[in-house]
């Protein structure tokens, strides 16, 4: 396939045009008064969004050279989204500002390699400054503010704060469609898994068709139970206590199932049998989770624990167990809190190591079940288009909130980046030549987000920047929604430090790459051969 090449200034200008097209489409969404963008879909209704990464992903330019620039900016947005879940528009605005200023200097004869070095040194100092001003989240209110700013909705902020309140930092929060127009949070308490009772004869509440066991003992094993003889000693011990028994095993059949059902019907021993959740290695891990949560042991051949030798100490305990046709919920497991913490830490480490998205999801689910539950945000809307857009905003806000829990919060509205210029000033003084110019490029770019927020809200960015910098309070900034100057922390205009940091680092990374580009190579488009037309007489 023949290729077309572009060199030097011509190549960089083509990249710049591509960058501008994407950035100009994305930056209109920045801030509380940012506009929406409507995206045509090849099927279904159009998507309405103000999420930077969703807009960037949809853009594919006709000119192949310009498209290379567009793809690089897309990379900034998606990388920031992957790391922090938000801040994609800020990252795009920063990248555009650095690229524009940088290309001016390269055209004037500056050395691109030295410019990149200066950019990197300035960004390093700015990131240190961001980390310095970050504050830990102080409670539910802060969580609500972070989520509300990301989703541009106080209602969504409250929902996420409620969900996080219930499940804690390690809990899992999922987003699903609601069957109504309402958006609300549904909470599943305790350890829940998708396996129900083996026989309907175990049912204690015929109206709801469920089994309710109060303060039961829990027998956990990875074996198939069919012969009753090995189980008789432990069944007798449990029957003497007068408490119910939940049996979790690979399968329960034959004599064992008959014995449990008959004892339940006679009233000798209230019990219920369910199959173990998962398959293979995952099943073993989940049984171990249940054992740790309830303070029991897994009666497994691998561990050398025989069913005949089981004592009441080997059984798990819980406050309550509910078993339906296809789900089991264990509430108030009596396991050692320290052992549960260790298990959660172990799963956390596995999450960090794994590269598979599926594996990550299943590990997070296991961790949430140990940590105390799963919250589901049910999203309702009048139309399919609104539902998609709302779900997307909630997912973004969730990611931003998790980022805030991780690295803390900083004043929002572009103020933190603007004030990070002070740290860059010191770098500029230390550097010389083209490296100094590189640091100045970052200095100038750090004011771009706040300028854009102000312009989207109909204000003059330069005037607002001057007024903010006249006050030394690091939290003093401009509330673009109300058009007032205020303390950003007190007003609840806050950003996760991780989002601000990632946006700056990713923007600088792409800007550096683009400035040091000398040649562009693209494939020559194939000339379409015209198909001969059929003569009219046919």
Curated annotation (Swiss-Prot):
It holds the Pfam family Cpn60_TCP1. One of its GO terms (biological process) is protein refolding. It catalyses: ATP + H2O + a folded polypeptide = ADP + phosphate + an unfolded polypeptide. InterPro entries: Chaperonin_Cpn60_CS, Cpn60/GroEL, Cpn60/GroEL/TCP-1, GroEL-like_apical_dom_sf, GROEL-like_equatorial_sf, TCP-1-like_intermed_sf. One of its GO terms (molecular function) is isomerase activity. Keywords: ATP-binding, Chaperone, Cytoplasm, Isomerase, Nucleotide-binding. ATP binds at residues 29-32, 86-90, 413, 479-481, 495. SUPFAM superfamilies: GroEL apical domain-like, GroEL equatorial domain-like, GroEL-intermediate domain like. It comes from Thermotoga petrophila (strain ATCC BAA-488 / DSM 13995 / JCM 10881 / RKU-1). Its EC number is 5.6.1.7. The gene is groEL. One of its GO terms (cellular component) is cytoplasm. Forms a cylinder of 14 subunits composed of two heptameric rings stacked back-to-back. Interacts with the co-chaperonin GroES. It is found in: Cytoplasm. Belongs to the chaperonin (HSP60) family. Together with its co-chaperonin GroES, plays an essential role in assisting protein folding. The GroEL-GroES system forms a nano-cage that allows encapsulation of the non-native substrate proteins and provides a physical environment optimized to promote and accelerate protein folding. This is Chaperonin GroEL.
């Amino acid at each position: 396939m023949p290729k077309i090449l572009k060199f030097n200034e011509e190549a960089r200008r083509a990249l710049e045009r591509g960058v501008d097209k994407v950035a100009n489409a994305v930056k209109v969404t920045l801030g509380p008064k940012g506009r929406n963008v409507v995206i045509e879909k090849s099927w279904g209704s159009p998507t309405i969004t103000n999420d930077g990464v969703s807009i960037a992903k949809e853009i594919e330019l006709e000119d192949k050279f310009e498209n290379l620039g567009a793809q690089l900016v897309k990379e900034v947005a998606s990388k920031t989204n992957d790391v922090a879940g938000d801040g994609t528009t800020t990252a795009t605005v920063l990248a555009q500002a650095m690229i524009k200023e940088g290309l001016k200097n390269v055209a004037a004869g500056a050395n691109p390699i030295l410019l990149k070095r200066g950019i990197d040194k300035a960004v390093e100092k700015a990131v240190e400054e961001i980390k310095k001003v970050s504050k830990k989240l102080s409670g539910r209110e802060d969580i609500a503010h972070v989520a509300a700013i990301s989703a541009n909705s106080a209602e969504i902020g409250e929902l996420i704060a409620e969900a996080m309140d219930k499940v804690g930092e390690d809990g899992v929060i999922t987003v699903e469609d609601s069957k109504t127009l309402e958006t609300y949070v549904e909470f599943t308490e305790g350890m829940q898994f998708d396996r129900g009772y083996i026989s309907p004869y175990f049912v204690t509440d015929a109206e709801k068709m469920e089994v309710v066991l109060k303060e039961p003992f829990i027998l956990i094993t990875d074996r198939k139970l069919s012969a009753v003889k090995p189980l008789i000693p432990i069944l007798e011990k449990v029957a003497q206590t007068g408490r119910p028994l939940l049996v979790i095993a690979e399968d329960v059949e034959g004599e064992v199932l008959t014995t449990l059902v008959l004892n339940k019907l006679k009233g000798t021993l209230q019990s219920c049998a369910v199959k173990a959740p998962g398959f293979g290695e995952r099943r073993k891990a989940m049984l171990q989770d249940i054992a740790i949560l309830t303070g029991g042991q897994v009666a497994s051949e691998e561990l050398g624990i025989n069913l005949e030798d089981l004592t009441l100490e080997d059984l798990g305990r819980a406050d309550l167990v509910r078993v339906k046709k296809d789900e089991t919920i264990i509430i108030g497991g009596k396991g050692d809190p320290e052992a549960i913490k260790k298990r959660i830490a172990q799963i956390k480490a596995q999450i960090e190591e794994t590269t598979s998205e599926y594996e990550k999801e299943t590990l997070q689910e296991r961790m949430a079940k140990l940590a105390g539950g799963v919250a589901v945000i049910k999203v309702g809307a009048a139309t399919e288009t609104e539902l998609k857009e709302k779900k997307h905003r909630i997912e973004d806000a969730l990611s931003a909130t998790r980022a805030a829990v991780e690295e803390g919060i900083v004043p929002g509205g572009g103020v933190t980046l603007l004030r990070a210029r002070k740290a860059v000033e010191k770098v500029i003084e230390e550097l010389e030549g083209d490296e100094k110019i590189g640091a100045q490029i970052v200095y100038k770019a750090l004011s771009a987000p706040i300028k854009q927020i102000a312009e989207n809200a109909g204000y003059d960015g330069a005037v607002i920047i001057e007024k903010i910098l006249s006050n030394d309070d690091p939290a003093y900034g401009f509330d673009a929604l109300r058009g007032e100057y205020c303390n950003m922390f007190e007003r609840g205009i806050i950003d996760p430090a991780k989002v601000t940091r990632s946006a700056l680092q990713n923007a600088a990374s792409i800007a550096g790459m683009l400035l040091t580009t000398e040649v562009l190579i693209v494939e020559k488009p194939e000339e379409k051969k015209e198909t001969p037309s059929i003569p009219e007489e046919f």
